[in-house]
Amino acid sequence: VISPVDSATADSRGTPSAVKRALVLLLLVGCNAEGPMREPHPVSVRDELRPTDTSSGEMWRFLPSDTVERYDAPDGGYRVHFTRLAKNAVPATDVNADGTPDLVEAVASVYVEVGAKYHGELGFRRPANDVALASNGGSDRFDIYLVDFAFSADGAFRTDACTGEKCIGYVVQENDFVGYNYPNATVATRILGSHEYFHAVQAAYDNNQGANFSEGTAVWATEHFDPTTNDFEGFLPQFLARPDRSLDTAPTGPVSGYAYGSALFFEFLSQKYGVPIVRKLLERTENGSGHPSEPADAANPRWLVQLDAILKADHQSSFAEAFHTFIYWNFFTGPAADATKSYANGAAYPAPMMTTVAAPYRVDNQRVFYAASAWFQVPAAGRATMGAQLVDDPATAEDETAGMALVIAVRRGGVNSLALPITDVKSAATFDTSGAATLVVAVVNTAREGNAGVLSKRPGLCIGSPDELSACASALRPAPDAGIPDAGVPDAGLPDSGIPDAGTPDAGTADAGIPDSGVTAVDPPKGCGCSTASPALGALLVLASALRRRYAAAN
């Protein structure tokens, strides 16, 4: 069914280009904890504006002169809004001559297919209904608006009303994809629509779980909707390039590819524990619905805490065990892939970023943030036996090896001849490295969160032959120093695996020279991700994420 929609009055201020507006917003307010935040609040007239409200100042909207039409998908609760003339026009091609442009029908069909997958097979909730909003697209159907993005992005989910942390919204997407790097508009919509629509699904549970959860689960959802796209694989290099970053902490600034690439962890969960675990996790993030085993987290749940509870209750496991296994699985990617021990499609995934060091290798304080890891590759250089161990400093009050784990592999010809997860990190674990090219060591912090504001552990690290390990461990266990405690004394900028920390404790938000992987995990401002784009900040997501997705997905 197609029906015209009345055009609104013209914007007397004029409209700068989408790109210029996005850059102006970025310069004025940025996209970090210091910028304006769109907190949950009662519905207001300003919030309820849609792209059809042409005088609204929305970045992506129809022109006052546009005649906007509606097309209702015949077999689903979706409505597509489009126009036939001027810059926002969809392609006029209508092969079946039914009066509706083919692209409009294709968009509607994709959303119907996406909805059937998400709400049928996968069992996720439908997006929150917008029937009570004054500007709701004319019905309670989920709305998709097709407008020209002028290469500022390719689409976004926008929220226009929230109750608590549950939000109502709609999707606005590129009208023709001409000049974009997708094979065609239908493929683009399959990638974009399945991703942005999943943000609407997330918003029906909780819209404030951070960029890694929001973007990671959305990319995961696209992969399960249509694994023939390479959207998922396209983001993995950016995630695996930063194994040292806490799993729930996205880089500062506009949403990055790292957040999208965190989909790998959710794919690991679904392959290891079953696909329903992601839905169960979303259900537990809803305010007031936290797992009963975590009463302190029930009112406003955090996803890592809730995942730990689900794993304990349903799988006799824990986040610590699962994360250790996740790192182990990541040893089997690329040329080292082994589907019997890791991902079904691991051959298509890159290896994590590693630091190449020479044995014997010693680090007095190897900083590893919670839910993160540090990777090393060490040439055997003729050593017949090699291994690694962690060492606690007896002068410190806290055991720096508590909650730590190792994964060690012997690689010959780029393939693991042996790889083992290790929990007894204080004992030297050694392996036959005769004829081996490389020993690969991952140091893993399996904690789900920091402890009393301290976000990392700093054990000593030794890698080498058995004799070298013994000498290293002895050197890292100094004799008592006449009663003078050295816990808390700055380390004068001595490098921890090459990263100077200037002796700054990590109980605060600063890293003292460590890139922002150690910044306290602050919930991102509303609107800094495409899942919660507000009128003030929503467009900023696309400068860092949508264009990246467009090119990564199509190559």
Task: Kindly give the residue locations of the regions a language model identified.
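Juxtacatalytic substrate-recognition/specificity segment
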Residues: G76-G210, T217, P227-D231
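C-terminal low-complexity, Ser/Thr- and acidic/Pro-rich disordered "stalk" regions positioned immediately N-terminal
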Residues: P480-G527
